[in-house]
Amino acid sequence: MRSTKVIHIVGCHAEGEVGDVIVGGVAPPPGETVWEQSRFIANDETLRNFVLNEPRGGVFRHVNLLVPPKDPRAQMGFIIMEPADTPPMSGSNSICVSTVLLDSGIIAMQEPVTHMVLEAPGGIIEVEAECRNGKAERISVRNVPSFADRLDAPLDVTGLGTIMVDTAYGGDSFVIVDAAQIGMKIEPGQARELAEIGVKITKAANEQLGFRHPERDWRHISFCQITEPVTREGDVLTGVNTVAIRPAKLDRSPTGTGCSARMAVLHAKGQMKAGERFIGKSVLGTEFHCRLDKVLELGGKPAISPIISGRAWVTGTSQLMLDPSDPFPHGYRLSDTWPRDE
């Protein structure tokens, strides 16, 4: 088979959300930091288009690129590529990356527990993997510092009127709204409507509320997180949530960065304190087990250090190739499966 490039990929999903991992065939992008490298990937778009667009990818797919770490504390770095964004951090993708690193032997597995330090674009993350019989069975990640930004802010959304929302950062930026406010329930049969309304809310939040990270060059709201009320049993809170990802799809997992942002909001509202746990449930019913580990400051703002825990499974291996006569070297997107990102 002739090809001008060959990219080696290990397929993976974390609690339902695809997070494939490039393990070979791509040189590290330019940049002095992993953050700068991720900005190159985002602005250049060549790799993003090749692996995410049809016919090699699809709107459902996230892909992670392994890179040598820049921080001496880390064993590996990774850059996350989502359908419309190249984010600072992702819970489900970090769980996929950790699982692939251990299950494939790229990093030596130690049973029953392997400790790793990885470098995401958003910063260093500590990983604890519960391992048995050559399989990383559960991954726990200390996420980057997370914080609430705006609480109970009014937001005008076409077709919905004025709704009350929170905004927060949990490794990525979110506008958070209760499902009852928009007349929805979080269930598979409403996935299309949830995704479309969520993207509309995200657009309105960027126009009316905005967001600015105190330390990173991250100046927009990426996602809408739609939630149902939390319940409490002792020191454990449980809540269903789903995240609308541009151009308009739902995260199949409970969204680790979303759970972190939600815990930051719960803490800011006095509804959760350090040491308490949160179980986030996805639209599929899968779970991330989270903990508000400690309270800290980030750039003068109150913040939390969250830990997120979930499972991932390798789904296969593949090689992406490009024949020199292929008319679609950058792929393509059609609005039947790639919703219009307006």
UniProtKB/Swiss-Prot annotation:
Keyword check for Lyase: yes
Q: Which InterPro entries match?
A: Pro_racemase_fam
Q: Where is the active site?
A: 90 (proton acceptor)
Q: What class of enzyme is it?
A: lyase
Q: Which N-terminal residues, if any, form the signal peptide? A: none
Gene3D superfamilies with a match to the protein in the record:
Diaminopimelate Epimerase, Chain A, domain 1
> At the top level of its lineage, which domain of life is listed?
Bacteria
Q: What is its EC number?
A: 4.2.1.77
Q: Name one Pfam family in it.
A: Pro_racemase
Entry binding sites for substrate: 91-92, 251, 256-257
Q: Which UniProt keywords apply?
A: Lyase
- State what protein this is by name: Trans-3-hydroxy-L-proline dehydratase
Q: Which NCBIfam families does the record associate with it?
A: T3LHypDht
Q: Which purpose does this protein serve, as stated in its record?
A: Catalyzes the dehydration of trans-3-hydroxy-L-proline (t3LHyp) to Delta(1)-pyrroline-2-carboxylate (Pyr2C). Displays neither proline racemase activity nor 4-hydroxyproline 2-epimerase activity.
Under catalytic activity, the entry for this protein gives:
trans-3-hydroxy-L-proline = 1-pyrroline-2-carboxylate + H2O
- Which family does the record claim for this protein? Belongs to the proline racemase family.
Q: Name one GO molecular function term.
A: trans-L-3-hydroxyproline dehydratase activity
